[in-house]
Structure formats: C-alpha cells, structure tokens
Amino acid sequence: MNLLIVAIGGGIGAIARYLVGQWMMKRFPDPPFPIAMLVVNLLGSFGLGAFFGLYYHELFAASYDDIGYLFGGIGFFGAFTTYSTFSVEAVLLIREREWKKLFSYVLLSIVGSIAAFLLGFYGTSSW
C-alpha cells in the first residue's frame, strides 16, 4: 500500500514538474542558464519546507509509515524536484565552457533551494 501512495504522489509530482517546466520554457525561450529547472527546484524546495512546516511543525518529524509523508514528501516533492536533471544541465554548461553561467546556476540552485526550504518551513511552521 505504501508503494502505491508514493507512486500516486510521484506521478502527480512528475506531471506538475513537466507542466511548470513547459510553462517556463515558453516564457523564457532563450534563458541565460537552465531557468526552468532552477524554478522547479526552488518551488519544490519551498513547497517541501512548507509541507513540513504545516504538516509536522518541526523538521523531519515524519515517519516512513506516515501517509502524508509518503504521498507528499517522498512522492510528490521527490518527483517534482530533480537533482539528476540539475546535474545534466550543469555538465552541459561545463562542456560548453560557460563558467559564469555554471557558477550562477549551481550557486542559485544549491543555496537557493536551501533558502527556499527554510523560508517555506519557517514561514508556515507557526501556523
């Protein structure tokens, strides 16, 4: 049953990632760096932080048997965000020797995702 809950959340998260990515690519057809995946990962980090803040009111209090965590934390946000695509896009920038774009993309992705998670968590944990 737990696998089904994760799969449903993951399916919805993957579809949401695709839709946000497509929307971003239409709005920014020639971005300075991979902005669609950056936005997806920042939104996902904020969303996961808000999910923990609203649902658990403390960091990482979830259990692997908790249906909400299985669906939202592992399923939806696990599929919505993507470290593997971030890595591919970073390697493409390395291959193209786009050092400034690479540095900006990596810094914004890593620091931005952590900041977005904390903003989501602390912005909602007292509700």
Curated annotation (Swiss-Prot):
Q: Which residues cross the membrane?
A: 3-23, 35-55, 74-94, 102-122
| Residues reported in the UniProt entry to bind Na(+) | G78, T81
Task: Alphabetically list the UniProt keywords.
Answer: Cell membrane, Ion channel, Ion transport, Membrane, Metal-binding, Sodium, Transmembrane, Transmembrane helix, Transport
Provide the protein's localization. Cell membrane
Q: What Gene Ontology molecular-function terms does this entry list?
A: fluoride channel activity; metal ion binding
Q: What does this protein do?
A: Fluoride-specific ion channel. Important for reducing fluoride concentration in the cell, thus reducing its toxicity.
Give the protein name, as stated in the record. Answer: Fluoride-specific ion channel FluC 1
